């Protein structure tokens, strides 16, 4: 049993002045060390190392004693490491395990990757945290270039949690990476789903809308929809400026700080499962009102037609990429209702939401009646309502 117990530790967040000799000197005070291997990053990032003990009990004691201790002014991170030999043994002798369904494993999203980072790079970076069942950098199908994010899957949930906590903000290939739980796409059922849903590419999605559009529509979460759930789902893709959820309708809007972050979110989350529901993601429509608020009075209260939506995106046929047959898209007219959705306490119509520093009174209808207000910042592609 002793031979099967881990004896190797990962030691990270080291100062560049730390040497193998110093690490051995410190860790040998806890127990006899078999060897120490220092890994120096050629890109100039902080080094890390692996320390192997002769006995598991000494390794466990070193983990407890050294994790969080300052060495040359830096608080080091110590964890169990998966050595290359044990990694090879596990994968070669566990063909049944390797073919398990992906939902039996625990998946970590890795974002903000440098273009040169490969699958082998992220696998090597996350290997110290436990047994990895899969790792990949997502590439564009057309160009073969990295999309700037990837996934690492662990057999053990604790290993995945630890990797998320320890690796978030660490430098890899010249960039600080972001980590979070990944929302994985479920196996496609034997139905029309696969034929109706096209695998989206980043280059395709990013060009489908104006560079000023940073808003993602996410629909299909018919139960359990909350702002916290949406923030947890979309935060790995970039800074979120605003979230609006409509639990009774089953959809939400997420506004990012950049067009590129929103595009990454659409590509990654579209078709995934959230709270047991397969969701659809595509661009929420931002109107020209946000650029030229003077024209606000002429557009409030009138939903865009199907043709207008297609003209905005340049080609109405592209709608099928985001709205497959049978998917019910909320019409713009839903915003004519008083704000009573989650996050809004008003029960009567109020001034339309124009974004920061904008506010205009609702327009006058016939006989002095007030037309329902609508948020000019958000507009969903949809059909005319009666």
UniProtKB/Swiss-Prot annotation:
Gene designation per UniProt: Tia1
Gene3D superfamilies: 3.30.70.330
Deletion consequences: 50% lethality between embryonic day 16.5 and 3 weeks of age. Surviving mice appear normal and live for around 2 years. Increased production of TNF in macrophages after stimulation with lipopolysaccharides (LPS). Increased susceptibility to LPS-induced endotoxic shock.
Domain comment in the entry: The RNA recognition motif domains RRM 2 and RRM 3 are necessary and sufficient for binding to uridine-rich target pre-mRNA.
Quaternary structure, from the entry: Homooligomer; homooligomerization is induced by Zn(2+). Interacts with FASTK; the interactions leads to its phosphorylation. Interacts (via RRM1 and the C-terminal glutamine-rich (Q) sequence) with SNRPC/U1-C (via N-terminus); thereby facilitating spliceosomal U1 snRNP recruitment to 5' splice sites.
Modified residues (N-acetylmethionine): 1
Record lineage: Eukaryota, Metazoa, Chordata, Craniata, Vertebrata
SMART domains: RRM, RRM_1
Protein's name in the database: Cytotoxic granule associated RNA binding protein TIA1
Keyword set, alphabetical order: Acetylation, Apoptosis, Cytoplasm, mRNA processing, mRNA splicing, Nucleus, Repeat, RNA-binding
Places the protein is found: Nucleus; Cytoplasm; Cytoplasm, Stress granule
GO molecular function ontology, one term from the record: mRNA 3'-UTR binding
Mod. after translation: Phosphorylatedby FASTK; phosphorylation occurs after FAS ligation in FAS-mediated apoptosis and before DNA fragmentation.
Superkingdom of origin organism: Eukaryota
Cellular component aspect of the GO annotation: cytoplasm; cytoplasmic stress granule; cytosol; nuclear stress granule; nucleoplasm; nucleus; ribonucleoprotein complex
Boundaries of every RRM domain copy: 7-83, 106-184, 214-286
Function text: RNA-binding protein involved in the regulation of alternative pre-RNA splicing and mRNA translation by binding to uridine-rich (U-rich) RNA sequences. Binds to U-rich sequences immediately downstream from a 5' splice sites in a uridine-rich small nuclear ribonucleoprotein (U snRNP)-dependent fashion, thereby modulating alternative pre-RNA splicing. Preferably binds to the U-rich IAS1 sequence in a U1 snRNP-dependent manner; this binding is optimal if a 5' splice site is adjacent to IAS1.
Annotated region described as Disordered, given as residue ranges: 355-376
Any single biological process term in GO: negative regulation of translation
């Amino acid at each position: 049993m002793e031979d099967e117990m881990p004896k190797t530790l990962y030691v990270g967040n080291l100062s560049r002045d730390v040497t193998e000799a110093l690490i051995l000197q410190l860790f040998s005070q806890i127990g006899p060390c078999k060897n120490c291997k220092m890994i120096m990053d050629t890109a100039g990032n902080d080094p890390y190392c692996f320390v192997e003990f002769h006995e598991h009990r000494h390794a466990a004691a070193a983990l407890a004693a050294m994790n969080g201790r300052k060495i040359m002014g830096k608080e080091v991170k110590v964890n169990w490491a998966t050595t290359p030999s044990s990694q090879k043994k596990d994968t070669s002798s566990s063909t049944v395990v390797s073919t398990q369904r992906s939902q039996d494993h625990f998946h970590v999203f890795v974002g903000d990757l440098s273009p040169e980072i490969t699958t082998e790079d992220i696998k090597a970076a996350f290997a110290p945290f436990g047994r990895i069942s899969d790792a990949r950098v997502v590439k564009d199908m057309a160009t073969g270039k990295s999309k700037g994010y990837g996934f690492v899957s662990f057999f053990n949930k604790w290993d995945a949690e630890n990797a998320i906590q320890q690796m978030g903000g660490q430098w890899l290939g010249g960039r600080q990476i972001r980590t979070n739980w990944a929302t994985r796409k479920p196996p496609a059922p034997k139905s029309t789903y696969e034929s109706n849903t096209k695998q989206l590419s980043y280059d395709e999605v990013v060009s489908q809308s104006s560079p000023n559009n940073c808003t993602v529509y996410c629909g299909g979460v018919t139960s359990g929809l909350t702002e916290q759930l949406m923030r947890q789902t979309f935060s790995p893709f970039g800074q979120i400026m605003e979230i609006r959820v409509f639990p009774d309708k089953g959809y939400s809007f997420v506004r990012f700080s950049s067009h590129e972050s929103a595009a990454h979110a659409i590509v990654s989350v579209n078709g995934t499962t959230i709270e047991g529901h397969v969701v659809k993601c595509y661009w929420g429509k931002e109107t020209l009102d946000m650029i030229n608020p003077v024209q606000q009075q002429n557009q409030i209260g009138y939903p865009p037609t199907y043709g207008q939506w297609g003209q905005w995106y340049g080609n109405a046929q592209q709608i099928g990429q985001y709205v497959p047959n049978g998917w019910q898209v909320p019409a713009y007219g839903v915003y004519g209702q008083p704000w009573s959705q989650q996050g809004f306490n008003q029960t009567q119509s109020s001034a339309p939401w124009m974004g920061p520093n904008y506010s205009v009174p609702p327009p006058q209808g016939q006989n002095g009646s007030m037309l329902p207000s609508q948020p000019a910042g958000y507009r969903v592609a949809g059909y005319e309502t009666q």
